[in-house]
C-alpha cells in the first residue's frame, strides 16, 4: 500500500448513487417499475399500521408525449393514510437508510432505501426536485419541494409551505427517466397482483396513455396489525449481543446544576439546604419512587459523604467494583481521590448493577422473547454460566461463547408470531375468486414456523379451470404482500413447484392452473436489495412443500371426481346413441309393435360436477 494513497469516507446515499443497481435501479425500464413499487408499498404500509382501509391513486405522465422512450415521466402517488409529521418529512424522503421499518415486525419495506432511492434516481436523471404533500390531521397540509444532497446524505429544502385541506394523507411526486413502453406490462401486472394480495385496498392507476385501471376492495376487514417484538435467541449474533449489552449499561450521570435540580425535585427538597445525613434520610424514605439516574447520584453521595455543593465540584473517574474502590477528581483540590466502598452497603448494589449490568438470567428474560426465569436458568446450566453472572463483566471470548450457546440451545420456545400479519384464508380466497373465477379453488394457511429465529407464515392458494386463460402452471409469488415479478427462476417458490410431480395429482399437459404463494415474515430472506426473489432457506422450503402438498391433494380429489363425472357423461352419451337402436332391433326381432320404455335409462338426473 502506497504511503501517498488517500482514504475517504462516503455517505450511504453516495454509495447507492454509485451502486444503484443493487436497489433495482439498473436501467430506465427497471427503475420506473421499482419506483412505482416503492411508493405504493410505502402507502399501503402506512395505512396498514394505522388500520386504515387503503385508497391509493397512482399516475404516470410523460413530460413530452411525442418523444420516444426512454424519456422523462412524472410519477405521482397519493394515499389516504396517516401522513408523516412535518418535522420528519425532509429526513424520511431526503436521507438514505432513514425510516420506521427497522423493528422486528412484518412490513413490506425493510431496508429504509426504496422511496429515497427512487428520489435519488429521479434527481440524477432529471435534476428535478421532489414534491411531498403531507397532512396528519386532515386540516393542515405541509408541502415540501426538495432535493437530496448526495455527498452529505441530507435533504435540501427548496420550499416549504402550508395550506388548509379536507383530509389526511400523503402525496409524493417525482420526475424520473423511464421506459414505459417496456415497463408498462410489469407495472400493470404489479398493480393487478397487489390488488389480488390486498383485497381490502382500492388501487387506481392512470397510465401515460390515458387508460385507467381500478381495483376496488372486495373485503372490508383488515388483517390484524403486527406488533414489534424482542429478538429470538436463535436469531442473534455477537454484534447483536454487544449492542444489547450497551443498552444494559447505565451511564454515570453528570452531577451538574440540572441534575441537582432533578435530585432536589424527586426528593422534595425544593431549595432547602439540608445536611448530608438529612439528605440521605430523605433518600431512604423515597428510594422506590426515585428514577435510576437519581438513585445513582444518591449512591455516589453515600460513599463520598458530600452534600450537593461539594458533589457538584467533582467528576467520577472510576467505579472499581472488583477492588471496591470509588475514584473521583476533586476540582477544588485539583487531585484524584479514591475512597473505599462497603459491599454490605444498601447503595453498593445500585452502583454494582450500574457498572456490571444485569445478571445473565435477568438479561435473558428482559431482552429476548418467550424466555422466562425457568428457561433462563436451564440455559445458564447448558451454557455453563453462573445465573448471577453479570453481563457487563463478560470478556469477548465469553460473549462468543454466550452467542453460540443461544443459537444451539433447543429448549427455547418457538418465535412469537404476533409480529406477523398474514392475509388470512378467507380474504385470499375472495381475492383469487374475483380475479380467476375458477372451477376449483382451495387455500391454506400454515402454522407459524421460524428460520434463524425469525418467525414466518406460509399462505398458499390453488385455482384450476374456469376462466383461467393461461395454459400451463402460472405462479404468483408474494412476500409480505409484495408481488415478486422479476428473477423468478431463482426463487424458492418456483423451485418447490418445479420439483413437484404433478402427474401424481392427475394434472397433466398444460393445465389451466394458478398457484398463489405468500410468505410473511419479520425478515424475508431476499437474495438482493431489490426484493425480487426469496432464498431457499430449508425451513421455508419445507413449509412451502407442505402447503403445496395439502392443496395438491385437494386438487387431486377434485380431478378424480371430475374424471368420474366426465366418464359418466361419456357413458350416458354412448347409451343415448345405441340404446334406441338396440330397442328398435329387439322390437322387430320379437315381432312386437311397441318398443320397450328405454328412455328412462338415459334421462336420469344430470350429473353435477362437485366443486370444492
Residue ranges and their predicted role:
Residues 73-74, 99-235, 332-340, 350, ...:
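GHKL-type ATPase core
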Residues 151-155, 178-200, 209-251, 362, ...:
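Charged regulatory segments coupled to nucleotide-binding catalytic modules in large multidomain enzymes
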Residues 40-76:
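ATP-lid-like helix-loop hinge signature
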Residues 1-53, 87-94, 224-225, 229-235:
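Bergerat-fold GHKL ATPase/HATPase_c domain
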